[in-house]
From Swiss-Prot:
PTM text: Methylated by PrmC. Methylation increases the termination efficiency of RF1.
Family: Belongs to the prokaryotic/mitochondrial release factor family.
Subcellular location per the Swiss-Prot or TrEMBL entry: Cytoplasm
Organism of this sequence: Rhodopseudomonas palustris (strain BisB18)
Top-level taxon: Bacteria
Entry keyword set: Cytoplasm, Methylation, Protein biosynthesis
Function: Peptide chain release factor 1 directs the termination of translation in response to the peptide chain termination codons UAG and UAA.
Protein name (Swiss-Prot/TrEMBL): Peptide chain release factor 1
């Protein structure tokens, strides 16, 4: 008995063959690039399907051998051991294919608008926000992505009260989307003379970079104000009105941008951030309803949820959504072991999707 619907596998193989045939015909440069990209995404799945069918065929041969009364005891014992190994391999490939066939988030391949804000904890929270930004920056470099700071408000003792950066790279949102939420740190500050552990927090928001066609924003729904940029002490640092504040009246969402001397650039940056926030606000509303129905631990969309604790004295990082603790805090903060947490969260999310499919079937 097949563990997967064979008709669906036939359709996949036929689609793959069709793409390869199209690639051999005369197509334009844009179509060629599109076909190559789709084939590159599909190839690992097709390889798994072919391996699954090959293992199934081999298991069928062993079944026939075991069903043959003429098979002697020694051969039967060898066949049974081989049958068990093939069954396990077949089940593993079937699970791999099921995961690959799960519905993809339409935003997974988008760039990311990463927003980090210091929360409770004063200067220590700002320092922690800086640590988190550098962690994501180093992780991005390891992925081959680029990071560009869009806006930053530095803390009094270092770090950031708020920092917004654009992370550009294939699959950036897919990897980082589960990082949204409250991150908590427990450590002894440099200024602490009694050796007491302080707790502070920072909030991370990971928003997919959306285009104008993704969000319908009516010009009448925007209030755009210009002003002179201000420094840390409130003094004006620019003689021209280059700073921009844009308010989306229906939602009350507001973005202020003054990092560039160019009003045009500040306005473009503010609109990019505003589009992402409007889209994200609607997705949070949808996700909160869905997660309440499914009782999902990962991807609930709740930004007020404490998702992770970084305990420096114990050298551990705990993700509270999946009860996973890694005693690799230096490696996580360095961006090197962050992928282990991200992979575990992705696996948990996929398991929830598979369970939902099973319940719906």
């Amino acid at each position: 008995m097949s563990l997967l619907p064979e008709t669906k596998l036939d359709v996949l193989l036929a689609h793959h063959a069709s793409l390869e045939n199209q690639l051999q015909s005369q197509v334009g440069a844009d179509t060629y690039v599109k076909l190559m990209r789709e084939l590159a995404e599909l190839n690992p799945l097709i390889e798994a399907v072919k391996a699954y069918r090959q293992v199934g065929a081999e298991r069928g041969e062993i079944d026939a051998l075991l069903a043959d009364a003429a098979t002697d005891a020694e051969m039967r014992a060898m066949a049974e051991a081989e049958h068990a190994a093939l069954e396990a391999q077949e089940a593993e490939l079937a699970q791999q294919i099921r995961v690959a066939l799960l519905p993809k988030d339409a935003m997974d391949d988008r760039n990311v608008m990463l927003e980090i804000r210091a929360g409770t904890g004063g200067d220590e929270a700002s320092l922690f926000a800086g640590d988190l930004f550098r962690m994501y920056e180093k992780f991005a470099v390891l992925q081959g992505w680029s990071v560009e700071v869009v806006s930053a408000s530095e803390g009094t003792m270092g770090g950031y009260k708020e920092i917004i950066a654009e992370v550009k790279g294939r699959g950036a949102f897919a990897k980082l989307k589960f990082e949204s939420g409250v991150h908590r740190v427990q450590r002894v500050p440099d200024t602490e003379t009694q050796g007491r552990i302080h707790t502070s927090a920072a909030t991370v928001a990971v928003l997919p970079e959306v285009e104008e066609v993704d969000v319908d924003i009516k010009p009448d729904d925007l209030r755009i104000e210009t002003m002179r940029a201000q420094g840390a002490g409130g003094q004006h640092v620019n003689k021209t009105e280059s700073a921009i504040r844009i308010t989306h009246i229906p939602t009350g969402l507001q973005v202020m941008m003054q990092d560039s001397r160019s009003q045009h650039k500040n306005r473009a940056s503010a609109m990019n951030i505003l589009r992402s926030r409007i889209y994200d606000a609607e997705q949070q509303r949808i996700d909160s309803v869905r997660s309440a129905e499914r009782k999902e631990k990962v991807g609930s969309g709740d930004r007020s949820e404490r998702i992770r604790t970084y305990n420096f004295p114990q050298g551990r990082v705990t993700d509270h959504r999946i009860n996973l603790t890694l005693y690799k805090l230096p490696q996580v903060i360095a961006g090197e072991a962050l992928g282990e947490l991200i992979d575990a969260l992705t696996t948990e999310h996929q398991a929830a999707q598979l369970a939902a499919q099973g319940n719906a079937a």
